[in-house]
């Protein structure tokens, strides 16, 4: 999820969030979550300055309302960002990165998550650091003065712990923070410095080509960075290619000189075994990653006599692949079969819906009973925590409980290391490998996709971990799809959303993100929630009792949908020889005896896709009774490509020799199949795609869409090019998709005519010329993104009005009244709002999970068209789709129901209902009408809470963030103030209006 969007909503005009990353601020024993954003400001004289904005939050940072500005650190000349660790610290593969931020009098320590986002963040911070040219004017940061606390003078030190928006000015603020010996080069523009004795320096496929070379240290093992003269083009190219392509392929040379255990040119394994003398040196508690165990617990879990460390270097800097290196890498991939062979490794895949329970039983009956020790464990959970706190916020103690239970349940005959843990609300995935294989795991990435309502709720969706094992790419997906027997289409949509939205960044930034399908091996597990259809409960139970699973399987929804090629096309599932895994009475093997008496079903499944995969077992585990589901496991033998060191070296030398003969003086040239693109009748939240092909000539080239002068991005906010950059071999093609999507951020200006579907894209060739692409089209105005007062003055459907009238009404001031206007008499509330609420009032007041279960995308488009054309009689959609459309409508309002100007007054009187009503009475007439109308509707829903299971807290949480929004560019609220906003709405749900 791109959290820079949430930060951007808090910034003033001229300020731009370049990139954001989630981290943890470490102060002594304290651990506090922080969102770090690098913000750029363009100066009037043409230069630019940067600052690091630190935000507090507990809820997922989706919009600006979810974050609260805590502190600002200008990126000045004395600013440095450095990876740190205590002497002899041991890293677990995939663990968090600890960095120290230093200015003249400021020192803060953060833990950042392992992955490409951290790598890109650190790279952008390094680029932002000002140079050391004395002739260059020092940054002044005058633009940050607006964020300083009004009651504080510039000369006053910044009080530590102040939760207001603070600017940490060089020389004025002193905030404590531990300092630790450096393990990596400093971030900023300093040169890399040799490490002290006893340190170990790691490198891998993501190192920048800075002119530094790897040299053996004179004293003891290990290597240091230093400058050296080039000693021949051939040796340098082999060395550089080996460093930058270790993720793709290569040989594994052991360098034993001086007692070093450093792994040299490594094609696939990225870790470096730590010297034996390092064992037993525990990582201080102050530097423990939030999701990692203490060192003693990790060692016990790994059961290892030697600890394997990860290649931390490959996440520290963005690669800058040269043209020659990319060509070498491409040729190596093409010749992969010449230097690799297939070797089988044993994989365990398991899935368990734990129904919000804590672990009560030993998991060895599921994870290790009756099988040989697997080489890799992939363990997925669903419904880890069903509490409302977990539903709306990040943290849950259940994560640590189940992590510990799994670690203790791994096979006792082997030693394992945790590679990665990823969680989205109640969906969690764990990846472990045998200790001896950890050195061959690389390019670990983890991502999440929520498919809950409005994309906000992670109660449904998927998490995935992708990695390179030797020379085979593997992706493991754990998903929890929509519930209820009749919602199979929603499940199909969830699957498609996960496939389309799950993207993993590559080490090479010039390459587009990887999708799930871009892997050699895919394992997909989870509670897919497909049920048995067309059979009553008793018939299902009878077939189970007779063990006639083949007959029962004929009515399985997943089988039917796969056969229809609507989901999991190309995937394989083993034969179901075990009884359905859902639904049981908790603590027993008895089928559901509750009032709902749900029919048994194979909800929990494991599928796979790829070559050289053999399933050895597929079973459920009836002995575990903690949940109303039974866990499922599958064991596979998976053929993985392993590098032959000698053959790799020969192949690499042949490629380098052949490239020595190439002429590099040629200017690249391409041809484009199309240069003008017209998007006709663009609609709100409806993706439009136009494609074209780039055909390369005879010279390899890099291409990229570049920014036009004085613009923040290469295209307007509603447009995107996929991929936006890449590399082309001679006489090769690549298809580019221009994707146009109008959302709440862009709809209002398109409605008003302030913006149009017009843009020019600049396609740049490295060492070549630029190509200009013209984009045009027309946008169909929509009620989504239109102001409340505008819609009240539109008695006709918006699509029946002239564009001039729509523009005039949209640009009217929000405080326009209903008297004295020369326009037609307005309606009290927007007719579009009435249509949706009336539909829900007539059809959905008793609907279970209303406003909590997402609708279908196709139905939303139908609802939008009915509202915009006024053809309400044609409205035919599920209650959940109409409910989600209502929420999207409120979210798209450019001025929220409770106007920005009264927002803080609402917070101040959230505990006083009389004062709260007084604030509402000051709203513009149309906004006040809408607020009272919505509150009356929600109170009607609460009258039916016995059927729809809604309560005041759920509705206040959902509607609070939609009706109450903080003004853009103002300081965001902390968690205490967010609760005040919820309490404000809660009052109107519990008291008479």
UniProtKB/Swiss-Prot annotation:
GO terms for biological process: flagellated sperm motility; in utero embryonic development; inositol phosphate metabolic process; phosphatidylinositol dephosphorylation; regulation of protein processing; signal transduction; spermatogenesis. Residues 342-668 are annotated as: 5-phosphatase. PROSITE patterns: RHOGAP (PS50238). Mg(2+) binds at residues 355, 383. GO terms for molecular function: inositol-1,3,4,5-tetrakisphosphate 5-phosphatase activity; inositol-1,4,5-trisphosphate 5-phosphatase activity; metal ion binding; phosphatidylinositol-4,5-bisphosphate 5-phosphatase activity. It is found in: Cytoplasm, Cytosol; Endoplasmic reticulum-Golgi intermediate compartment; Early endosome membrane; Membrane. Substrate binds at residues 383, 459-460, 582-583, 596-598. Residues 224-302 are annotated as: Disordered. Pfam families: Exo_endo_phos2, INPP5B_PH, OCRL-like_ASH, RhoGAP. The modification Cysteine methyl ester is found at residue 990. It catalyses: a 1,2-diacyl-sn-glycero-3-phospho-(1D-myo-inositol-4,5-bisphosphate) + H2O = a 1,2-diacyl-sn-glycero-3-phospho-(1D-myo-inositol 4-phosphate) + phosphate. Residues 991-993 form a propeptide. InterPro entries: Endo/exonu/phosph_ase_sf, Ig-like_fold, INPP5B_PH_dom, IP5, IPPc, OCRL-1_2_ASH, OCRL1/INPP5B_INPP5c, Rho_GTPase_activation_prot. The ASH (ASPM-SPD2-Hydin) and RhoGAP (Rho GTPase activating) domains form a single folding module. The ASH domain has an immunoglobulin-like fold, the Rho-GAP domain lacks the catalytic arginine and is catalytically inactive. The ASH-RhoGAP module regulates the majority of the protein-protein interactions currently described. The ASH domain mediates association with membrane-targeting Rab GTPases. Hydrolyzes phosphatidylinositol 4,5-bisphosphate (PtIns(4,5)P2) and the signaling molecule phosphatidylinositol 1,4,5-trisphosphate (PtIns(1,4,5)P3), and thereby modulates cellular signaling events. Belongs to the inositol 1,4,5-trisphosphate 5-phosphatase type II family. This is Type II inositol 1,4,5-trisphosphate 5-phosphatase.
């Amino acid at each position: 999820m791109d959290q820079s969007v949430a930060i951007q909503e808090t910034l003033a005009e001229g300020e731009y969030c370049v990139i954001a990353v989630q981290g943890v601020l470490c102060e002594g024993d304290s651990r506090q979550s922080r969102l770090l954003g690098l913000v750029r400001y363009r100066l009037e004289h043409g230069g630019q300055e940067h600052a690091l904005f630190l935000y507090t939050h507990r809820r997922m940072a989706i919009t600006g309302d979810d974050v609260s500005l805590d502190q600002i650190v200008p990126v000045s000349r004395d600013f440095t960002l450095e990876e740190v660790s205590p002497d002899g610290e041991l890293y677990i593969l995939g663990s968090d990165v600890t960095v120290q931020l230093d200015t003249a009098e400021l020192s803060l320590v953060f833990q950042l998550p392992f992955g490409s986002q951290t790598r890109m963040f650190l790279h952008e911070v390094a680029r932002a650091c000002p140079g050391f040219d004395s002739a260059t004017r020092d940054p002044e940061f005058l633009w940050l003065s607006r964020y300083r606390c009004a009651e504080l003078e510039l000369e006053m030190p910044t009080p530590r712990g102040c939760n207001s928006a603070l600017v940490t000015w060089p020389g004025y603020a002193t905030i404590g923070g531990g300092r630790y010996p450096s393990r990596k080069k400093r971030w900023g523009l300093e040169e890399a410095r040799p490490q002290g004795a006893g340190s170990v320096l790691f490198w891998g496929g993501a190192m920048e080509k800075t002119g530094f070379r790897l040299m053996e240290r004179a004293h003891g093992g290990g290597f240091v960075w230093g400058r050296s003269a080039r000693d021949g083009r051939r040796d340098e190219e082999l060395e550089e290619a080996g460093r930058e392509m270790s993720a793709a392929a290569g040989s594994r040379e052991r360098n034993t000189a001086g007692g070093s255990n450093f792994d040299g040119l490594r094609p696939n394994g990225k870790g470096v075994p730590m010297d034996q003398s390092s064992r037993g040196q525990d990582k201080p508690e102050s530097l423990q990653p939030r999701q990692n165990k203490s060192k003693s617990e990790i060692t016990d879990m790994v059961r290892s006599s030697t600890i394997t460390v990860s290649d931390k270097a490959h996440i520290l800097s963005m690669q800058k692949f040269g043209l020659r290196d990319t060509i070498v890498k491409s040729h190596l991939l093409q010749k992969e079969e010449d230097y690799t062979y297939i070797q089988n490794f044993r994989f365990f895949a398991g899935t368990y819906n734990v129904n919000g329970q804590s672990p009560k039983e030993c998991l060895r009956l599921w994870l290790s009973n009756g099988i040989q020790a697997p080489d890799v464990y992939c363990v997925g959970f669903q419904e880890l925590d069903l509490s409302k706190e977990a539903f709306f916020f990040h943290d849950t103690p259940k994560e640590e409980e189940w992590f510990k239970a799994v670690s203790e349940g791994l096979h006792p005959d082997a030693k394992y290391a945790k590679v990665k843990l990823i969680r989205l609300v109640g969906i969690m995935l764990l990846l472990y490998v045998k200790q001896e294989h950890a050195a061959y795991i690389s390019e670990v990435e983890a991502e999440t996709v929520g498919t809950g309502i409005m994309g906000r709720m992670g109660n449904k969706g998927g998490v995935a971990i992708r990695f390179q094992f030797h020379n085979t790419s593997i992706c493991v997906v754990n998903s929890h799809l929509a519930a209820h027997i009749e919602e199979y289409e929603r499940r199909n949509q969830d699957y498609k959303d996960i496939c389309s939205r799950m993207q993993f960044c590559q080490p090479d930034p010039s390459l587009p993100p990887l999708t799930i399908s871009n892997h050699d091996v895919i394992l997909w597990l989870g509670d897919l929630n497909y049920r048995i259809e067309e059979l009553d409960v008793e018939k299902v139970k009878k077939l189970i009792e007779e063990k006639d699973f083949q007959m029962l399987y004929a009515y399985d929804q997943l089988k039917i949908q796969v056969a229809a090629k609507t989901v999991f096309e190309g995937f394989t599932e083993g034969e179901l020889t075990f009884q359905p895994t859902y639904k049981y009475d908790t603590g027993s093997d008895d089928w559901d005896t509750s009032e709902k008496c749900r029919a048994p079903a194979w909800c929990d499944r494991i599928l796979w896709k790829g070559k050289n995969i053999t399933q050895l077992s597929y079973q459920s585990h009836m002995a575990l009774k903690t949940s109303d589901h039974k866990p499922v496991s599958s064991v596979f033998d998976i053929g993985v490509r392993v590098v032959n060191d000698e053959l790799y070296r020969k192949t690499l030398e042949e490629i380098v020799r052949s490239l020595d003969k190439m002429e590099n003086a040629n200017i690249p040239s391409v041809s484009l199949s199309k240069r003008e693109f017209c998007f006709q009748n663009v609609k709100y939240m409806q993706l439009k795609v136009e494609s074209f092909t780039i055909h390369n000539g005879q010279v390899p080239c890099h291409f990229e869409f570049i920014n036009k002068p004085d613009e923040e991005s290469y295209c307007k906010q509603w447009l995107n090019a996929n991929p936006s950059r890449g590399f082309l071999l001679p006489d090769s093609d690549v298809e580019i998709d221009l994707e146009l999507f109008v959302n709440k951020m862009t709809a209002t200006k398109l409605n008003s005519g302030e913006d149009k579907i017009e843009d020019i894209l600049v396609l740049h060739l490295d060492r070549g010329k630029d190509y200009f692409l013209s984009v045009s089209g027309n946008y169909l105005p929509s009620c989504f993104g239109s102001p409340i007062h505008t819609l009240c003055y539109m008695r006709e459907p918006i699509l029946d009005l002239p564009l001039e009238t729509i523009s005039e009404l949209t640009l009217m001031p929000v405080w326009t009244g209903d008297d004295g206007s020369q326009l037609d008499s307005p309606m009290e509330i927007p007719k579009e709002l009435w249509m949706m609420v009336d539909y829900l009032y007539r059809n959905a007041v008793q609907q279970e999970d209303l406003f909590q279960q997402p609708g279908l995308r196709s139905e939303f488009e139908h609802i939008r068209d009915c509202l915009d054309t006024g053809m309400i009689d044609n409205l035919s959609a599920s209650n959940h789709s109409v409910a989600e459309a209502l929420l999207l409508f409120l979210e798209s309002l450019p001025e929220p129901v409770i106007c920005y100007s009264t927002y803080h007054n609402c917070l101040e009187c959230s505990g006083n209902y009389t004062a709260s009503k007084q604030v509402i009475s000051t709203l513009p007439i149309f906004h006040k009408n809408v607020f009272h109308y919505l509150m009356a509707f929600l109170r009607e829903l609460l009258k039916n809470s016995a059927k729809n299971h809604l309560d005041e807290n759920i509705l206040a949480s959902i509607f609070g963030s939609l009706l109450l929004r903080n003004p853009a560019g103002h300081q965001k609220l902390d968690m205490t103030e967010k609760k005040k906003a919820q309490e404000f709405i809660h009052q109107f749900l519990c008291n008479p209006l």
